[in-house]
Amino acid sequence: MFILSSSSSLPSPLSLSSSRVSLPPPSSSSLNLLPLSPHFQPPNLACSCSVASRSTAELLHDFKHSAHTAASADEARNHLPHSRAFLDVRSEQELLSYIRREAEAGKLPSNVAAGMEELYQNYKNAVLKSGNPKADEIVLSNMTVALDRILLDVEEPFVFSPHHKAVREPFDYYTFGQNYVRPLIDFGNSFVGNPFLFKDIEEKLHQGHNVVLISNHQTEADPAIISLLLEKTSPYIAENMIYVAGDRVIVDPLCKPFSIGRNLICVYSKKHMFDIPELAETKRKANTRSLKEMALLLRGGSQLIWIAPSGGRDRLDPSSGEWLPAPFDASSMDNMRRLIQHSGVPGHLCPLALLCYDIMPPPSKVEIEIGEKRVISFNGVGLSLAPAISFEAIAATHRNPDEAREAYSKALFDSVSMQYNVLKAAIYGRQALRASTADVSLSQPWI
């Protein structure tokens, strides 16, 4: 329900002028970040093609104006009266009945109402499988709040800025997301690899360094899962991480309330670049703003950014029948490295492995329409971090710059894959802590 990282094309050469930022031209490919217009509104879900009629100019409002507009819209929605009947329901029957009444009254698009019902049933089934004696109570409590927030956003859509900061008050969207995903995790069969390295990262952040986590990406719930696995030992990291997020999770009504609770850099996804062909070039040109926003953040130091250079979620390999990390895009990696290098403060790129696909697996293929089916399960998950990998050390063994970039991307990907296999052995191989290796020390800090 949350994050979809992205990749796309960058105009080249690129020059960003600012009193604080000066960047060299990126490589011939891309960093792959494409910002959303701050005024981008969800398409009419009754017709997935309706967004095509939207003027391209609407996607490119001035950034300064956008920041003010987003703040004003957020302030207005917090004082806007909206139907709160979801919070008053006391049973499943009342909840489902209210969804149907809202749809019949025209307050909910029919497909959003259907998505709400499907989400409720799938969430209920997953939590019941946990064996928690309070499962029914947990389901009703969490789903009433979730549906209340979804309905609020349908009535008064939230507007994301290119750099969105998690909304913690007057309603705490971060805690809401944590509480919603928590019952889906089998903590008895979940693991964190090398937790001491997260402590090292936190120390570097407090020293003013930047850290970029180069990760695979498995589900929309990745940010909540990462935060839940770190909340006991590294709450600062859990709450302050910035995620590079694709446009769909800030447009889909069932995703938006969860995305509101995360720190995001909002981008357009390469996989959806040509969904509306006439907007493709506009999206590419808009990339300058997103680059500038990230560059400004990194220039200030103490930033922790999560990015998936694969450009999307890992998907089931039809030949092997396994979920494996999707390959990284070397040009994306190189441009991220160059942003760090030219930020003016120390920076580190660290490989992070995430295994959680069973919690909320993506569709088997990339879909154009907004509103994918949400399959939800109760399962163990895993997270593992490895030390930063130095580009200079790898480049020293390659005379050809292109070969050095490819080798660096491969080194990061190989580390993620290695850690992923350890997590897989622990969770699905039932080896638990015995799956630890010389490079990955597994722990369960919540026990």
UniProtKB/Swiss-Prot annotation:
Residues 1-48 form a transit peptide. A motif (HXXXXD motif) lies at residues 217-222. GO terms for biological process: CDP-diacylglycerol biosynthetic process; phosphatidylglycerol biosynthetic process. InterPro entries: G3P_O-acylTrfase_chlp, G3P_O-acylTrfase_N, GPAT_N_sf, Plipid/glycerol_acylTrfase. Its EC number is 2.3.1.15, 2.3.1.n5. One of its GO terms (molecular function) is glycerol-3-phosphate O-acyltransferase activity. GO terms for cellular component: chloroplast stroma. It is found in: Plastid, Chloroplast stroma. The keyword GTP-binding does not apply. The keyword Lipid biosynthesis applies. It is an enzyme of class 2 (transferase). Keywords: Acyltransferase, Chloroplast, Lipid biosynthesis, Lipid metabolism, Phospholipid biosynthesis, Phospholipid metabolism, Plastid, Transferase, Transit peptide. Pathway: Phospholipid metabolism; CDP-diacylglycerol biosynthesis; CDP-diacylglycerol from sn-glycerol 3-phosphate: step 1/3. It catalyses: a fatty acyl-[ACP] + sn-glycerol 3-phosphate = a 1-acyl-sn-glycero-3-phosphate + holo-[ACP]; sn-glycerol 3-phosphate + an acyl-CoA = a 1-acyl-sn-glycero-3-phosphate + CoA. Residues 1-21 are annotated as: Disordered. It comes from the Eukaryota. The HXXXXD motif is essential for acyltransferase activity and may constitute the binding site for the phosphate moiety of the glycerol-3-phosphate. Esterifies the acyl-group from acyl-acyl carrier proteins (acyl-ACPs) to the sn-1 position of glycerol-3-phosphate. The physiological acyl donors in chloroplasts are acyl-ACPs, but acyl-CoAs are used as artificial donor for in vitro reactions. The enzyme from chilling-resistant plants discriminates against non-fluid palmitic acid and selects oleic acid whereas the enzyme from sensitive plants accepts both fatty acids. Squash is chilling-sensitive. Preferably utilizes oleoyl groups (18:1-ACP) and has lower affinity to palmitoyl (16:0-ACP) and stearoyl groups (18:0-ACP). Belongs to the GPAT/DAPAT family. PANTHER family: GLYCEROL-3-PHOSPHATE ACYLTRANSFERASE, CHLOROPLASTIC. This is Glycerol-3-phosphate acyltransferase ATS11, chloroplastic. It comes from Cucurbita moschata (Winter crookneck squash).
